Each structure stands twice: as structure tokens, then as C-alpha cells.
């Protein structure tokens, strides 16, 4: 059910899990083309897939839930008096303690990676999605332009599809056993740019994450990356309760070794060929400060409300 406001649309649903379905993606696209945004309203028990979360964030949408006390922004304790406030700034007087998500039982790893490809005839896209899950013994099984991703995973066919869409940027959704990912491909200056956000069940060590990224670098140029670990739902969705702050594991960013310094909590090494101007930082302790690395990369927590 949808309701129109002056500059946004309210879409209400009782779905237990909100996927990036073709219908929801179509609504966000149509509203966006008209200059508006979508506020999604669901019960507090609902959750979002990684694909839906990124689609919502990419179009400037909001997620609002109904609970016993009324309306609030998902992931926060910020209350709304009415849906007319869906895109208004939060007021401190309306903020209450956020509820806790009831399913925080498993450790999950998120790879957020940007890579650059030379547009050769032999190029195969999808390297991040295929190579990185191997660190935890996972493999992708399907892809599609919406969820559920039902086309059998095949990098050659995926590449043929994406080449047919160039120069238009294309967003894809990928599924696998305890694996969820989004993949965006667009044309850059003399290259194809691929951005992947990959969520896996399981915990990866700094050393394992480093080896996986260095393996990926042999196939493409990793321009930036951030690997983090959090605790969350077993179905790899995000609930509407208070969010767990991810623990950084590894980052790849621009920089020079002379500007960096190892200490007890981080270890810095050159990444890529000599003179590439990139460094890899391993956060060896859970209390390591990842703020500077995240700021350089322009990443935020995957579960934050807006990018």
C-alpha cells in the first residue's frame, strides 16, 4: 500500500523480510525519476536484505517501523509523531533508547570493495563476488537484477549481460549459501569500475582477509576496500533494533608507507605494485582505531541510515 506526499511516497508493508524485489525497485526508480523518495514502513519485527538496504540507501529512502510506542526510524530510538516527518531531521526530544535486535547470535563478515578493470576482450566481471567468499568456503550460486537472484552463477554470462548494458550503470544482486551481495558496474575513464558489498556468515581474521584481497589484486586493481566483522541475524538481514558497530579487520586505501606507522593495534604494508600509492592496513586488535581509514575510503557502516 502506498501513500503520496508532496515530495515523497510512503510504502507500507507487512512483509517479514523486505527484499529488493522488482516491484520495490521499480517503485524507487519511478519515484526517484519524479524527484521524490520512498519511506518504507513495516512492523518492527521486519528486516531488510543487504540488497534492499543498499537500494534504499542509494535512492535516499528511509525505513520506519511501527511498534507498541508508535513510529520510529529503524536502527535508532528516534520517534516520529507522524509519517509527515519521514524526511525531517531528528529532534532530540523525540529520541528514546533504541530497542535491541533479538537475533544477534552469529558473526558475519562484510567485504566492501571497489576494483578497476581494463576493458579487454577477455575480461570477466564478478571477480570480487567469486574470489572473496572463498576465504570462508562460500560460493555464489545466483545473480539477477532483483531479488531473489535466480540466474545460475556464471561469470561469462554475467559479463555478457553487463557489457550489453554499458554505458549505463548496472546494479546486480547475488545470492549463495549464507552469502548475500550487491554488485554495481559502471564505465570509468578508460576502465570498467566494479563496486561490491558482500556479506558472509562467519568470522575472517586480518591475515585471511589480507590474503583474499591480494589474490583479488592479481585479477583486477583493488582501488579501495574495507573488511569488517559484526554480529547479526542468521539470515544475513538487518533488523530494526539497535545496530551493532562493525569491527574493522582490513582496509586498502591510497597512501604511502612513509606516511604510515605500525603500532600495537595496526600493521601497514604496501599494496599492489611498487609506486601504486596504495597501502593495506591490518587492524590486529578489536580496539584499533579505524576512523582515519574509513574516512579516507568514504565508507560508512553498511547498516547506517544514509550514505
Where do the language-model regions lie?
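Acidic, serine/threonine- and glycine-rich low-complexity intrinsically disordered segments
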Residues: 120-242
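C-terminal interaction module
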Residues: 1-141, 219, 223-307
Amino acid at each position: 500500500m502506498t501513500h503520496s506526499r508532496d515530495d515523497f511516497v510512503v510504502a507500507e508493508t507487512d512483509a517479514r523480510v523486505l527484499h529488493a524485489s522488482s516491484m520495490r525497485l521499480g517503485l524507487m526508480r519511478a519515484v526517484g525519476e519524479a524527484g521524490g523518495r520512498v519511506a518504507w514502513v513495516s512492523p518492527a519485527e521486519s528486516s531488510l536484505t543487504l540488497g534492499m538496504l543498499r537500494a534504499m540507501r542509494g535512492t535516499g529512502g528511509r525505513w520506519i517501523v511501527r511498534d507498541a510506542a508508535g513510529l520510529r526510524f529503524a536502527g535508532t530510538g528516534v520517534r516520529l509523531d507522524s509519517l509527515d516527518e519521514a524526511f525531517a531531521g531528528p529532534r532530540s526530544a523525540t529520541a528514546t533508547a533504541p530497542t535491541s535486535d533479538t537475533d544477534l547470535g552469529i558473526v558475519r563478515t562484510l567485504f566492501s570493495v571497489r576494483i578497476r578493470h581494463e576493458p579487454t576482450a577477455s575480461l570477466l566481471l564478478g571477480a570480487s563476488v567469486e574470489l572473496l567468499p572463498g576465504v570462508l568456503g562460500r560460493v555464489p550460486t545466483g545473480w539477477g537484477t532483483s531479488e531473489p537472484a535466480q540466474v545460475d552463477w556464471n561469470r561469462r554470462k554475467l559479463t555478457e549481460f553487463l557489457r550489453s548494458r554499458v554505458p549505463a550503470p548496472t546494479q546486480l544482486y547475488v545470492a549463495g549459501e549464507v552469502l548475500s551481495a550487491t554488485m554495481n558496474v559502471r564505465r570509468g575513464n578508460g576502465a570498467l569500475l566494479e563496486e561490491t558489498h558482500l556479506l558472509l556468515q562467519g568470522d575472517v581474521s586480518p591475515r585471511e582477509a589480507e590474503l583474499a584481497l591480494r589474490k583479488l589484486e592479481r585479477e583486477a586493481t583493488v582501488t579501495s576496500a574495507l573488511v569488517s566483522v559484526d554480529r547479526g541475524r542468521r539470515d544475513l538481514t538487518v533488523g530494526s533494533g539497535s545496530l551493532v558497530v562493525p569491527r574493522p579487520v582490513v582496509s586498502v586505501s591510497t597512501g604511502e608507507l612513509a606516511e604510515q606507522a605500525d603500532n600495537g593495534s595496526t600493521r601497514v604494508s604496501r599494496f599492489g605494485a611498487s609506486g601504486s600509492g596504495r597501502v593495506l592496513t591490518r587492524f590486529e586488535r578489536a580496539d584499533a582505531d579505524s576512523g582515519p581509514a574509513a574516512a579516507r575510503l568514504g565508507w560508512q557502516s553498511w547498516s547506517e541510515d544514509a550514505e
